[in-house]
Amino acid sequence: GVLYPNLIGYAVMPAAIALIILTVRAVVKGRYQKLWTLIPTLLLGLIGCALAHPNALVSVAVFVVPFLLAMIGKVVRTYRKSRQTAIAGGIILAALATCVAVWYMIRPGEFASNTWTSVMSEGEAVYQFLFFGLENANQLGDKFEPSYIMAFLTLWGAGYLIYKRRNLWIITSWILVGYLWVISASVERGPFRMLMVSPWYTDHFRLATLVVLPGVILSGIGLGAIVQSVLKFVLARLPRVNDTRYTQVLLVASAVIVLVAAGFTSRTQAVHDATLAVSKEYRIEPSSVIVSSDEMNVIEHIPDYVPQGDIIANNPWDGSPYIYSLVHRNLTGYHFDFKTDEKYRPIYKHLKDAKTDPEVCKVVNENNVHWYVHFKNPLNFGPDAQNLYDGMSDAVENGVLTPVYTSGEMGLYRISACDS
């Protein structure tokens, strides 16, 4: 996301989740003195998640629900009629209710999910979830590349936790996040899809990224279990001598195993290719989707004509909000997700009729909106919202504007029909 960088939110998530786990365990064990440092740190972590991207905060809430349920089970199993048990149970229940409320309440309007639909069958989605393909090459042409070693290590890690009956909630978190991914990738648009995954805009890419977090934890546990088993096997067959060289050799062997596994499971090339494909959209070229070379040419010349206090009428879906960040001129629309200011509605809907509709010029002159910028929206972003701006897009051909600076089809215009 340009406004909210989703990956930054996901990068903060592991620390926020770890802080929640430490805080809850401190409460359960009655180590309240630790809360003086844990709670402020946790609040900062959660605020950081929310600022980076709101759906990262929702992701934290979803991820820790199985952990909180496990902690409630532990409190119930070890129940003692004591104040500490009552406090611990109450705090965990409150935290669980908060997580559900965060998932239910922090979500954009339904229109924000219009872009994302189901892209595969349920069976294919489950297969991709288990084998960590997760559309890793979709940016380059819908090619599924399963990671068999990663899948094996993850399933081995899950089996190891089940065998040891330890931290089973991690498996549940992995399955829960995977279930949300399957919904976003395979379930048709409807009330159920909107209920379950609209906090992520029903965007399967966001949830594909999220699946990796519990998957990596499980695969790390699986790799650790394998290395541990290999070391035990080797040690059992070595002479029992008190020689530190054995330990050193085994540590080196362990490091080699880990590095080899990392080499075979890394998706460096896939990440490189996807990053390269996305980076092309941010280059200033004639065909660039975000800001083309013609649009940038117009933006750079706007300060030569538009005074600091004037406002430029614009359609926020066409890239024109970059005018504000790049050359510091005010606009009628700074971001397509912001609510349209009602006072500008006559301009949006009827600028083309400025010669015959006095309401248009009244708004133009009262608010110093003497300019209009015309850019392109080549991918037709926000198709449902474009009718809000029909009056401006048609004004170019209606004789109510005077071109001030143009480059190709892009241009800055003076709303000359409203000049006294």
Residue ranges and their predicted role:
Residues 1-278, 325, 367, 371-374, ...:
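Membrane-embedded transmembrane-helix bundle of lipid-linked glycan/lipid transferases
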Residues 263-420:
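Extracytoplasmic
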